[in-house]
């Protein structure tokens, strides 16, 4: 479930840590918002120090899609293809109705690892090029992938971890839209 934490107009880390309090979390997924980059090792509660910080792959895909469509950078297509193949694996697991334990095993398989190696190699290849040879959008997407590599691939550690938070964001989006409509109605 995606929950956006705001207090006095802030999405800061303190808002999230105050909300979590002493709860124990196995994992927490976010976008790459800077306030959450230290989740798992700097949260106030001692019992959250081992929390796995996951970063949503859908946010990464959107960055490469933007590089392809707005930046007109065809090199983004190669990385998008690899990410799409990771999603194809996840959809096949869903269709088969496998257990979280089986999903963990398959995510640790050569098939998944090969895709992650391929993704990393393409990332490193693109980053080795002079920045002038790519669009600013592709540079942003590459830097995001590089910076959050561990968090973006952490979903493979446990079959219970989602690859993204799309379902939760779609749910929250409906609530947010309804709230915005209600507020504008009362104005």
Label the predicted regions.
Residues 1-187:
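Catalytic center-proximal scaffold of phosphoryl-transfer enzymes
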